[in-house]
Amino acid sequence: MNTCTPNIKSSYTYEDLLASGRGELFGKEGPQLPAPTMLMMDRINLMTENGGLFDKGYIEAELDIHPDLPFFSCHFIGDPVMPGCLGLDAMWQLVGFFLGWIGGKGKGRALGVGEVKFTGQILPNAKKVTYRIHMKRVINRKLVMGMADGEVEVDGRVIYTATDLKVGLFQDTSAF
């Protein structure tokens, strides 16, 4: 069984997030964030073990938007827009990060999402994306799994919402 002990830090810099991608933040047994260019945040402003809509934990993170971000040059030529799936992946990344933050061990894998709604887009002239994750449940048994609702906001406007984001931590992913 995993024993989850919360990390005492409540915010993380870009350098901290890169350390997570190298397996240095939560140790070699803990979950890792992806490295750039798949890392979809520049900082985590707030992590709480309680709080959020369900009082099970809350995460707020940001991504600074620049016209030279790699996806703008290919999605789509002449009509650049950040792929919506990257915003969804960012929310999964944050749920997995939360599981590592509370002391969970294993390799993080997205397990699903209940519903996703897109009501806007992220264009190269945007300034900042804010992600908000409201943890709903954490299971800490042989498998550590987190479930959350989340939203993506661009320049103060909510443009994506997701319910029942699920991420699990696995000791062995060979049979996954």
Swiss-Prot record:
It catalyses: a (3R)-hydroxyacyl-[ACP] = a (2E)-enoyl-[ACP] + H2O; (3R)-hydroxydecanoyl-[ACP] = (2E)-decenoyl-[ACP] + H2O; (2E)-decenoyl-[ACP] = (3Z)-decenoyl-[ACP]. Its EC number is 4.2.1.59, 5.3.3.14. It is found in: Cytoplasm. The keyword Ribosomal protein does not apply. Disulfide bonds: none annotated. GO terms for cellular component: cytoplasm. Keywords: Cytoplasm, Fatty acid biosynthesis, Fatty acid metabolism, Isomerase, Lipid biosynthesis, Lipid metabolism, Lyase. SUPFAM superfamilies: Thioesterase/thiol ester dehydrase-isomerase. Pfam families: FabA (PF07977). It comes from the Bacteria. The active site is at H75. One of its GO terms (biological process) is unsaturated fatty acid biosynthetic process. Necessary for the introduction of cis unsaturation into fatty acids. Catalyzes the dehydration of (3R)-3-hydroxydecanoyl-ACP to E-(2)-decenoyl-ACP and then its isomerization to Z-(3)-decenoyl-ACP. Can catalyze the dehydratase reaction for beta-hydroxyacyl-ACPs with saturated chain lengths up to 16:0, being most active on intermediate chain length. Homodimer. This is 3-hydroxydecanoyl-[acyl-carrier-protein] dehydratase. The lineage of its organism: Bacteria, Pseudomonadati, Pseudomonadota, Gammaproteobacteria, Pasteurellales.
